[in-house]
């Protein structure tokens, strides 16, 4: 013990000597740490039993609350705090565990570092990639803002990969072209090797520490607090201690990510459960285009782990059992860098026609071993590691077995390009006061029927920032927060109590697996009416089985059984809208490929001159957005439709891209 005391005294003496040697500015103590995670301990918080004596509620008041702390949520939250708004951020995960961390490939922006480029060419590629279901005003906004967004990230300290002369390195990615599709392959994708999402999320998280945002970490958002058709905050469950919190705010931003876990095989984290999408549904508001689910061409066979499109951007090729580079037959110009929906369908056809690989002939190969080992080591280090761990493959010597895997949800909460959530009434869009959405949870719609690779990370940053700017334009810090009823959130607490004591016959895990396998079997890469109809029936039945659930943990402290059951409820609402929307859409467009309706059905036949053609009525064509609603008590799905926005923000500066036959 005496030795320990002597060592302690010695270290203290050295620290004192070092402190005296520091400049005076550094002797004022540690840097202020603004990442406030004890949101429930704020002096302004008030406890009441206005809902139930069994579930006391802690009430909070903020100028704005952001739900979700991935790339979009963080950018919205610190953007609001930077503008002076008293901001809360509610997240069921610590921010750096959000699924943004898993993105690999990069961020598209027309910087022109590898060759001449123009954001208008990027605009054209994105409209074409969307199969003309994207709203061109939002696409205009996003592509024009992209270069500035990348520069902003660089200024925040994001360590982009570099060219030899020090510029941000840009790789080729699918569906990207020069000169409006006539100038060959574009190199537009800015990256940090193959760990771009990881770098982006940590960069934004680091930036967020500069601002006084109150983070409610490991709080599960249950529902929106709606009064008089406007949003006034959220109600959330503190997972750590089981307390209920009502966070009242003048503005609410939903940034909860996608719902990939409705499917059995997907690249999404197990926490991608469509929580925000489901909250919108329970609030009686519509979701948009949920039938458009992207299957990434290269998930590791058997594991579903993502292998970035950046592999093909660096020169990787897809081959079948005959060693043929088969994409040359399906996309003669773009080949392996065609858009994701085209590549996934081509792979599926190769397997169907008997040219699959392996003993079961049920996958294809991604070949990288023809590339220089130093290129693999510097540009694709994470992929080399992932392939070894999950496929047992040394990418310098053998190909990776891959299969299309659910990766992204193009649909979500309908918004305009400012991030304001929309409802559609009597043929007109109406803004829902106080409610915003961004990231994969939202549908602006910049991706339409198919998202181009490397267009999502930039979507997070641009529209997270747009939400903050929009709130800053319409409100001031300290504006009066509208009141809520004393029992606001009562239904959410009743539902939580019901699930906590659920004593049926079906485990949450069993019902979730049945839903995931049904979605995988009935709404996959290729779809057909009879199978979709069967799937609608199965998912509806499974939704009804929610009332037969059995939970086992009756406590309130770290009750993960309860949280997973709440997530299952959310997934079911997303699954219902996805499969009913797919069954109703009698055409093939982007990621929605119907074998019984193989043509894209527009208002005109764009394979021919439109002069002399009669425009189809709105109800007779499918170039329109699906709006879906669910009666939560019965599971009945109702569908409506709203027109696609073709006008840009400034036709003189960026002309509308008219629909055309889409080929690569």
Curated annotation (Swiss-Prot):
Tree of life domain: Eukaryota
Membrane topology category: Peripheral membrane protein
Residues engaged in binding oxaloacetate: 296, 340, 407, 451, 454
Residues at the catalytic site: 340
Modified positions (Phosphotyrosine) in chain numbering: 215
Keywords in alphabetical order: Acetylation, Electron transport, FAD, Flavoprotein, Membrane, Mitochondrion, Mitochondrion inner membrane, Oxidoreductase, Phosphoprotein, Transit peptide, Transport, Tricarboxylic acid cycle, Tumor suppressor
Main location as per UniProt: mitochondrion
Residues that bear Tele-8alpha-FAD histidine: 99
Binding-site list for FAD: 69, 72, 91-92, 98, 100, 105, 221, 275, 440, 456-457
Record text on subunit structure and interactions: Component of complex II composed of four subunits: the flavoprotein (FP) SDHA, iron-sulfur protein (IP) SDHB, and a cytochrome b560 composed of SDHC and SDHD. Interacts with SDHAF2/SDH5; interaction is required for FAD attachment. Interacts with TRAP1. Interacts with LACC1.
Functional note: Flavoprotein (FP) subunit of succinate dehydrogenase (SDH) that is involved in complex II of the mitochondrial electron transport chain and is responsible for transferring electrons from succinate to ubiquinone (coenzyme Q). SDH also oxidizes malate to the non-canonical enol form of oxaloacetate, enol-oxaloacetate. Enol-oxaloacetate, which is a potent inhibitor of the succinate dehydrogenase activity, is further isomerized into keto-oxaloacetate. Can act as a tumor suppressor.
Protein name per UniProt: Succinate dehydrogenase [ubiquinone] flavoprotein subunit, mitochondrial
């Amino acid at each position: 013990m005496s030795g320990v005391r002597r060592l302690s005294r010695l270290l203290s003496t050295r620290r004192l000597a070092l402190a005296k040697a520091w400049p005076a500015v550094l002797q004022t103590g540690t840097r202020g740490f603004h990442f406030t995670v004890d949101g429930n301990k704020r002096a302004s918080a008030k406890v009441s039993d206005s809902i139930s004596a069994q579930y006391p509620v802690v009430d909070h008041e903020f100028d704005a609350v952001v739900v979700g702390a991935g790339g979009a949520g963080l950018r919205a939250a610190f953007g609001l705090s930077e503008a002076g708004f008293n901001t809360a951020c509610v997240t069921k995960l610590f921010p750096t565990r959000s699924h943004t961390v898993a993105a690999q490939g990069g961020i598209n922006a027309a910087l022109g570092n590898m060759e001449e480029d123009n954001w208008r060419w990027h605009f054209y590629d994105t409209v074409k990639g969307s199969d003309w279901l994207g709203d061109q005003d939002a696409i205009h906004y996003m592509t024009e803002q992209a270069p500035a967004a990348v520069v902003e990230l660089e200024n925040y300290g994001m360590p982009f990969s570099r060219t030899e002369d020090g510029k941000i390195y840009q790789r080729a990615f699918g569906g990207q072209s020069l000169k409006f599709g006539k100038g060959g392959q574009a190199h537009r994708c800015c990256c940090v090797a193959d760990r771009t999402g990881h770098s982006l999320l940590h960069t934004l998280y680091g930036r967020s520490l500069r601002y006084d945002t109150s983070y409610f970490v490991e709080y599960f958002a249950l529902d929106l607090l709606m009064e008089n058709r406007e949003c006034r905050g959220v109600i959330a469950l503190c997972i750590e201690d089981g307390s209920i919190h009502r966070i009242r705010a003048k503005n609410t931003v939903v940034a909860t990510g996608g719902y990939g876990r409705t499917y059995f095989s997907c690249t999404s984290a197990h926490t991608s459960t469509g929580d925000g999408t489901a909250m919108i549904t329970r609030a009686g508001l519509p979701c948009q285009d949920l039938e458009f689910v992207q299957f990434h061409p290269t998930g590791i066979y058997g594991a579903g782990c993502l292998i970035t499109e950046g592999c093909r951007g660096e020169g990787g090729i897809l081959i079948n059992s005959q060693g043929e580079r088969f994409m040359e037959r399906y996309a003669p110009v773009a080949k392996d860098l065609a858009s994701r929906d085209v590549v996934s369908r081509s792979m599926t056809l190769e397997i169907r026609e008997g040219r699959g690989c392996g003993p079961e002939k049920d996958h294809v190969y991604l070949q990288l071993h023809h590339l220089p080992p130093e290129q693999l080591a510097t540009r694709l280090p994470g992929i080399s590691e992932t392939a070894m761990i999950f496929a047992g493959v040394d990418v310098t010597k053998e190909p990776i077995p891959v299969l299309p895997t659910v990766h992204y949800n193009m649909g979500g909460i309908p918004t305009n390009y400012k991030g304001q959530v929309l409802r559609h009434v009597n043929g007109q869009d109406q803004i829902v006061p106080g409610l915003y959405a961004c990231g994969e949870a939202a549908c602006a719609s910049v991706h339409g029927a198919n998202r181009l690779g490397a267009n999502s990370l930039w979507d997070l940053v641009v529209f997270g920032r747009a939400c903050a700017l929009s709130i800053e334009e319409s409100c001031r810090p300290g504006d009066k927060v509208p009141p809520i009823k004393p029992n606001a959130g009562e239904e959410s607490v009743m539902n939580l109590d019901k699930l906590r004591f659920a004593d049926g016959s079906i485990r949450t895990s069993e019902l979730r697996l049945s839903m995931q396998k049904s979605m995988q079997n009935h709404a996959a890469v290729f779809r057909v009416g009879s199978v979709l109809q069967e799937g609608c029936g199965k998912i509806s039945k499974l939704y009804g089985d929610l009332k037969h659930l059995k939970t086992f943990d009756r406590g309130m402290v770290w009750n993960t059984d309860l949280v997973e059951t709440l997530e299952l409820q959310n997934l079911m609402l997303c699954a219902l809208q996805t499969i009913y929307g797919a069954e109703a859409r009698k055409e093939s467009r982007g990621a929605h490929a119907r074998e019984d309706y193989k043509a894209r059905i527009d208002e005109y036949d764009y394979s021919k001159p439109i002069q002399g053609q009669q425009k189809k009525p709105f109800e007779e064509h499918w170039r329109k957005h699906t709006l879906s609603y669910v009666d939560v008590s019965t599971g009945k799905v109702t569908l409506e439709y709203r027109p696609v926005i073709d006008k840009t923000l400034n036709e003189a500066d960026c002309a509308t891209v008219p629909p055309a036959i889409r080929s690569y």
